[in-house]
Amino acid sequence: MDQYSSSLVDTSLDLTIGVTRMRVEEDPPTSALVEELNRVSAENKKLSEMLTLMCDNYNVLRKQLMEYVNKSNITERDQISPPKKRKSPAREDAFSCAVIGGVSESSSTDQDEYLCKKQREETVVKEKVSRVYYKTEASDTTLVVKDGYQWRKYGQKVTRDNPSPRAYFKCACAPSCSVKKKVQRSVEDQSVLVATYEGEHNHPMPSQIDSNNGLNRHISHGGSASTPVAANRRSSLTVPVTTVDMIESKKVTSPTSRIDFPQVQKLLVEQMASSLTKDPNFTAALAAAVTGKLYQQNHTEK
């Protein structure tokens, strides 16, 4: 039996021989790769730290550069600005302008001063707005206010808040006088005209010029003006020009009182002129005064 068994051929296969050899052969490359990976990781970490340090240094240098540039700009601005702010006589200004090439700077400075002055003048003109109320008849639709000045109408329109139209006037002396006027009836009372003045006249009232000229002519002829009317009309008949212009006699000897021309306010004169022109008794009183004066003059000459 033992002999028979020993004579048989062993046909079994050892399947584990090759695998064991492959494992033994693969062990050395795996460890080498792990070591290489660790080395590369360490190097990468080191490079990352170096890059972070470089970025920090770059930011610090950039910040320092910006601060230096700002300081340089401020220093240059301080060096250039004092000649502009300094106020010196005309010769020093001319010299500084010549040194800096300041012809353009001088002209620009003058232009800036002119613009500032113009803006201030425009602001002052805009602030001078006045409003005056005039009593008229409701049937009057002309929207004309007799305030002593001459006006030119250049427009009219209807507003939303008032059924009455609004008329626009400008001074007859325009463009030398830039005063404008808006006239419209009051919403509460249609018999009241509301005149809004924008600006201030730069010339005297035409009626004042005529009255002063008439008074000068009368005084040069040696005459004296009088107003023999009732006491309640005396105050309103002291200013009219007609009485002064028509009486130029050299032989008036009756004791009369001389006309007084006080310096009244413009608003008072405008109100007085408006009330006199609309008073129906004013014409009759003026005619009576002139007739009485002419009669007195003829009686004295005889």
From Swiss-Prot:
Pfam families: WRKY. It comes from the Eukaryota. The keyword Oxidoreductase does not apply. GO terms for cellular component: nucleus. Residues 140-206 bind DNA. Its main location: nucleus. GO terms for molecular function: DNA-binding transcription factor activity; transcription cis-regulatory region binding. Belongs to the WRKY group III family. This is Probable WRKY transcription factor 40. It comes from Arabidopsis thaliana (Mouse-ear cress).
